[in-house]
A protein has these predicted regions:
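Conserved catalytic or regulatory cores that recognize and/or transform ribose-phosphate-containing ligands
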Residues: 1-147
Length: 147
């Protein structure tokens, strides 16, 4: 317990292609981390007023896609990416929830940013370690992969 106390963790995982917006697993793990004295940076509950990804935000993005208003999407997502990547900068380590049946884009970017910054990346794969993308085996320790 002592080694994790006063550290900060970022919770990395899909948000825009999952029914619950990525909230459920984060709500499950957050109290466990806090009990260990770990601060949590959750992109579903950002510590800022900007770049909030709630139902209204997702609906606005989907409507913009239908209307081919790609400029709106770019401006909106640029802010989201900036805030989320800044949280990676601040975090001491990252916990990533990976469901290989869901297309990940931002999550992989966040994960590889953490790896480049030499921060521990702990990956929990819904389908088991044996189903993780091959690339992950080449860029992170086996000891950081979990089923």
């Amino acid at each position: 317990m002592g080694k994790l106390k006063h550290t900060v963790c970022y919770l990395c995982g899909a948000m825009d292609r999952v029914a619950d917006g990525g909230v459920t697993w984060r709500r499950t793990i957050t109290p466990k981390l806090k009990k260990l004295g770990v601060g949590v940076l959750d992109p579903c509950d950002k510590p800022t007023e900007c770049a909030v990804e709630d139902d209204d935000f997702r609906n606005n993005i989907e409507n913009a896609k239908k209307e081919k208003n790609f400029r709106f999407i770019k401006e909106s997502m640029r802010e989201v990416a900036a805030v989320d990547l800044r949280m990676i900068d601040i975090a001491h380590f990252v916990v990533m929830y990976m469901d290989v049946s869901v297309h990940l884009c931002g999550s992989y970017h966040e994960a590889f940013t953490a790896i480049q910054q030499k921060k521990p990346l702990l990956v929990v794969c819904e389908q088991g370690v044996e189903n993780m993308p091959n690339w992950m085996f080449g860029v992170m320790p086996l000891e950081h992969m979990f089923s």
